[in-house]
Amino acid sequence: MKKNYTAIILDIQHSRKFDDDKRLYIQDKLFSIIKFINDYCNKELVKKFEFSAGDSIQALFYNISDAFSCYCFIKNLFYPYQIRCGIGYGKINQKFMDQNYVSTNMLDGEAYHYAISALHDCKLEKYDFLIYSSNEERDYFVNQIMSTVELLNLDHTYKQADIFNLFNLLYPLEIRRGGMNIKEISTFIINKLKENVLSYKFEDFTSSGSIKLILGEVTYNYQERKKQLHKLFDQRFSTKINSVCAVLLNVSRQNIEKMRVVGKFDEIRKLECLVLEYIRNEYEHEKKD
């Protein structure tokens, strides 16, 4: 039986609204992210991310769950700008695979056709995310949950959105290491947080104390979650993260806790965890049958 792969195509939302300078800045931001992700997820990628056309990037994953968690991470790294995502799960033309093309632009097959259709419908129906495969029933289940996630995110104020981004980058849905060490990962996250969080002033963000705090938090998360490789660490954010964010943003812990509850941070994370587990159980089990 032919193996299924996962094609993922992302593009920048509303890119035509930006002037040339802003658009160049945003494209540079996305370029730095995919360069990082290609190292961060190098064991999960069949073909690395690359620009395919205009503001679009695409890649090919072995597993659909890895593609989904990678999308969630890229979305948070790219914040406050938005991306659309089409994921396609299916076969790849084996003749193209046998040629061992380096570029994903040279590949073809139903996984790519599904991903292209999913991205097209995202634009048409104004969704952020859609997943398509040969099983419409399970696709519908995933897409409905992710639609709920989008609606919950839309309810966030600017400050809530900034704090939620901080939560997600310090405590991603899943961990990866690739060929990178924790310090490299932490440094990249620190640089992105300085770009992303706009509602608060990070006077001491580049101080040794703040960097040590973030490095310590990322290290702790990675070490603890490494013990449960490819398993969910928790369906809630850690309670410790409230204090970490309060120190970084120079606000009270109670303020962070209130934002967390009102913004339904844990509810959103639980829904994303549900999607991740469902994808593993309902899509990837086919390979074992």
Feature names for model-found ranges:
Residues 1-289:
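Regulatory and interdomain segments flanking nucleotide-handling catalytic cores
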